[in-house]
């Protein structure tokens, strides 16, 4: 088992929490961050809204049926990026091995941290305390020997908590881990696993590598390693971007048409970055990762600069 010390920091209901900080009179009410419209989907939901079954990627129409009293606020991506920059400034006090996953989550390798703190759990506590002191927002953290385990652990004490998974407890932890907690296991894959008698990562571990390959394709190789607590991926430090991008990870498998409901949000976020950096774009690429980790990309390149109004349309044409 790796001797690395990896922290996965995940802000709690980030977009919704930022909006509640800006509009404290809404605290205690179910708040949804989304554009209103028949085809819109939720960007984020406060914990009060989640009690009614609301979650990101849910259609606004469905959300209004489940929780008619919810308060809807439009997203403010410029503000979210500003707050995210504050959070990353906190990270840099402890390590330069920071791998952002989105505005509200990142991996940190604190095996050798700037403050020489021996216990990664203590590093996570300090980081979470500093984030709260400087932004008024709470974060959850998972601490483990690798990225796979740290990401799972960060969800274990949400919200505003942390979970430490030391190397000697990994196998026992995985033995009872529900399959749905494994990244990449969506509804379709989970149903297939259950048909094979699998319920936990421990059940999955009893299958040979070749068997998993037969059942799940190339993803079977990845599963074989993950359920044994193996993930050698390094934390990739931030590098200067050669392109401007934005992305979203959906919490569950969705039909293509419903997933496409996120394109207006992504297009607006992308255009804000383009205008802020004072650059021009002539090509647009759409990347889609499927439940079994296949990546599909489509790129369109034009002879003229893309105007604001055309960006979302170009994304749909991809």
From Swiss-Prot:
Catalysed reactions, as listed in the record: DNA(n) + a 2'-deoxyribonucleoside 5'-triphosphate = DNA(n+1) + diphosphate
Ranges of residues in domain UmuC: 6-186
Binding residues for Mg(2+): 10, 104
PROSITE patterns reported for this sequence: UMUC
Superkingdom classification of source: Bacteria
Protein family according to the UniProt entry: Belongs to the DNA polymerase type-Y family.
This protein's name: DNA polymerase IV
Species: Neisseria meningitidis serogroup B (strain ATCC BAA-335 / MC58)
Gene for this chain: dinB
